[in-house]
UniProtKB/Swiss-Prot annotation:
GO terms for molecular function: RNA binding. InterPro entries: SmpB, SsrA-bd_prot, SsrA-bd_prot_CS. One of its GO terms (cellular component) is cytosol. The keyword RNA-binding applies. Required for rescue of stalled ribosomes mediated by trans-translation. Binds to transfer-messenger RNA (tmRNA), required for stable association of tmRNA with ribosomes. tmRNA and SmpB together mimic tRNA shape, replacing the anticodon stem-loop with SmpB. tmRNA is encoded by the ssrA gene; the 2 termini fold to resemble tRNA(Ala) and it encodes a 'tag peptide', a short internal open reading frame. During trans-translation Ala-aminoacylated tmRNA acts like a tRNA, entering the A-site of stalled ribosomes, displacing the stalled mRNA. The keyword Cell inner membrane does not apply. This is SsrA-binding protein. Its main location: cytoplasm. PANTHER family: SSRA-BINDING PROTEIN, TMRNA-BINDING COMPONENT OF TRANS-TRANSLATION TAGGING COMPLEX. GO terms for biological process: trans-translation. It comes from Lactobacillus johnsonii (strain CNCM I-12250 / La1 / NCC 533). Belongs to the SmpB family.
């Protein structure tokens, strides 16, 4: 029986528009019970999220996971900081990148892998407004060539 590829839950489409993605890295997320249930129900928003390194630990900040519908008084806070599960050397490398000017560490995708929630984080450099215009112009030219010549 063929298994689905990575069970994509959420994708940050705005990230590729706002950043040049230099490299990617897979990390686990430390979640509570109601959070994983909400993620499985696809009630997560990555748009404004980022990764912050604090005291040798990586945290996923400003990612909204909606409260679980059937949750009771023990439901989670939707915008709480969530610890990322990474090796020390990966955290040290990300801390060096975070210290550089103009570099950001952002979540790109959340997916399930063997039943566990994983986040694909990307190291990105912010785009300027003219870079965004050039990207749109190039995409339109490629579409026109494809439409005209069927390449």
């Amino acid at each position: 029986m063929k298994q689905k590829a990575d069970n994509l839950i959420a994708q940050n489409k705005k990230a590729s528009h706002d950043y040049f993605i230099k490299e990617t890295l897979e990390a686990g997320i430390a979640l509570t019970g109601t959070e994983i249930k909400s993620i499985r129900a696809r009630r997560i928003n990555l748009r404004d999220g980022y990764v912050q390194i604090i005291n040798g630990s990586a945290f996923l900040e400003n990612v909204h996971i909606s409260e679980y519908k059937e949750g009771n008084r023990y439901n989670h806070d939707p915008l709480r900081s969530r610890r990322l599960l990474l090796h020390k050397r990966e955290i040290a490398r990300l801390a060096g990148i975070q210290a550089q000017q103009g570099m950001a560490i952002i979540p790109l995708k959340v997916y399930l892998k063997h039943g566990f929630a994983k986040v694909l984080i990307g190291v990105g450099q912010g785009k300027k407004q003219y870079d965004k215009r050039q990207t749109i112009k190039k995409r339109d030219q490629d579409r026109e060539i494809h439409r005209k010549y069927g390449i």
